[in-house]
């Protein structure tokens, strides 16, 4: 958490709140969050104007013209905008003071979030180095490529979907939902999937992540959008967090198990494990 739908919702909120604003000062309380040169980060950001707010997978891209501030929220990161005085909070770690008098604050209970300030010309190389897969859209997420990679891999399907190389943006919540919708057991070896299963995984990834965006993300644990509001996708989750409840498709009780060290929710009847 947050996954692609939540990050996209944050992106839209940031765009509505800070587009066109000039950064006049930056205060950084947790230096380890910045993965590029600290001095450059502190000295370069003041005077920059936020020209657009984009997203690639789970990364937010704050476009400053020739530079891009790449923000990864990791487990608990979120942005808040205060029009005047900023309240004390030990979890507020980065403060972007804006020319209109407001302050954009990055909050992160776990302190896992990261910032990279890079030249826009280096953005493609930045993501290539991380082997980030395509966006989950029909135009970019090609079935034939997805199929070829899966059938040549010995990885288990759930960890494979989570590693961001097949497709960008899936996390634990949405992988469980995709696997249930596609009727695939999470411990199935990628290479043992048949073509019909692969097509279902492909199509359901696109559909479910789009639904997550439409519903403003899933509010489980601490997620809120930039405007402080909850998402509603949690009301549409079929298996994640539904342990003991009847499967919406067949009525069998949803069970929780561990796959690749991650809590995983499945229907044991709809998602049969291969012998």
From Swiss-Prot:
Binding site for DNA: 91, 110
SMART domains documented for this protein: Fapy_DNA_glyco, H2TH
EC numbers: 3.2.2.23, 4.2.99.18
GO molecular function: 8-oxo-7,8-dihydroguanine DNA N-glycosylase activity; class I DNA-(apurinic or apyrimidinic site) endonuclease activity; damaged DNA binding; zinc ion binding
Keyword DNA damage: yes
Cofactor(s) the record lists: Zn(2+)
Family membership: Belongs to the FPG family.
This protein's name: Formamidopyrimidine-DNA glycosylase
Name of encoding gene: mutM
């Amino acid at each position: 958490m947050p996954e692609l739908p939540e990050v996209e919702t944050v992106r839209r909120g940031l765009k509505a709140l800070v587009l066109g604003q000039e950064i006049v000062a930056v205060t950084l309380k947790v230096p380890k969050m910045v993965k590029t040169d600290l001095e450059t980060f502190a000295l370069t950001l003041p005077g920059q104007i936020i020209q657009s707010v984009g997203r690639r997978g789970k990364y937010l891209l704050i476009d400053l013209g020739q530079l891009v501030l790449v923000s990864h929220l990791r487990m608990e990161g979120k942005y808040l905008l205060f029009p005047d005085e900023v309240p004390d909070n030990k979890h507020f770690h980065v403060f972007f003071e804006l020319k209109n008098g407001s302050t954009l604050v990055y909050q992160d209970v776990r302190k896992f979030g990261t910032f990279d300030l890079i030249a826009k010309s280096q953005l493609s190389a930045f993501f290539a180095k991380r082997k980030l897969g395509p966006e989950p859209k029909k135009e970019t997420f090609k079935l034939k490529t997805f199929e070829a990679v899966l059938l040549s891999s010995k990885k288990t399907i759930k960890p494979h979907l989570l590693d961001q190389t097949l497709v960008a943006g899936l996390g634990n919540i949405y992988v469980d939902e995709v696997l249930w919708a596609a009727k695939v057991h999470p411990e199935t070896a990628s290479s043992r999937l048949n073509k019909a299963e692969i097509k279902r995984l492909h199509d359901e990834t696109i559909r479910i992540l789009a639904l997550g965006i439409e519903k403003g993300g899933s509010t489980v644990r601490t997620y809120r959008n930039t405007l402080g509001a909850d998402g509603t996708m949690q009301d549409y989750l079929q298996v994640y967090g539904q342990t003991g409840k009847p499967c919406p498709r067949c009525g069998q009780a949803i069970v929780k198990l561990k796959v690749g060290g991650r809590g995983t929710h499945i229907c044991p009847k709809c998602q049969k494990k291969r012998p």
